[in-house]
Amino acid sequence: MQMPSTQTSKPPQLSQTPVSAAVVVKALKNSVKAAFLTSSPQAPGTLKPRALVRPSPGPVQENHLSEAQFPPKL
């Protein structure tokens, strides 16, 4: 009786992990969109593409973080 109860309690935990990941991804996308919307009127869009083109090999997340930090500083 106790064995099936533990098995049924495990699947919900596994299903919650992808849901939380999806929520985090959505939050990141929303924050990036907000950063672009707030930075586009303040700074020219020519600087953003160049910054995105330079770190194309992989560190794209770092660039997004730096862009997200710029609007609050201004």
Swiss-Prot record:
It comes from the Viruses. Residues 39-74 are annotated as: Disordered. This is Uncharacterized protein 7.5K. It comes from Human parvovirus B19 (strain HV) (HPV B19). The gene is 7.5K.
